[in-house]
Amino acid sequence: MNNNNNNNNNNNNNNNNNNNNNNNNNSYDSNHSSSSYTSENQNREQQFVFIPEEELERQSLLKKKDNLSYSINKDEIIIINNEDENDQNQTKDSTNPIVLRAKKVVDSFFCKIILVFICLVAIYSLVVIKCDGFHFNHCSP
């Protein structure tokens, strides 16, 4: 009888230990790997983490060499070949608010010049047509 009680106590202790282990596995930090991970957690870990270029330079993680740029995945560096560096510079400039404002000013300035030129040509052509076609008195010398 005493032996059975000991066995029951041992079984209860083992069950409690198993429950504790299960609870620990469920609360295991998502940054560590575990065999009890679900595929959803693994997929979430494999997604890219995009870090701004300025931040990468600040951390000395971004190294530009041979026209290559690097982006960081948690455990690996992915290298992207930038074939045309001029295109890359243009895209950087196009997102710069100062450059955008300058482009708007230049565009509006040229539009105004073109409109003024068209108006002058239209006024000149109207005056010439009236003077030559109808021979108004104020047109002749």
UniProtKB/Swiss-Prot annotation:
Domain of life according to the entry: Eukaryota
Low complexity biased stretches: 1-39
GO cellular component terms, semicolon-separated: membrane
Transmembrane segments: 109-129
Keywords of the record: Membrane, Transmembrane, Transmembrane helix
Keyword Transmembrane helix included in the entry's annotation: yes
UniProt membrane topology term: Single-pass membrane protein
Residues covered by region (Disordered): 1-48
Transmembrane as UniProt keyword: yes
Main location: membrane
Compartments in which it is found: Membrane
Record's protein name: Putative uncharacterized protein DDB_G0280391
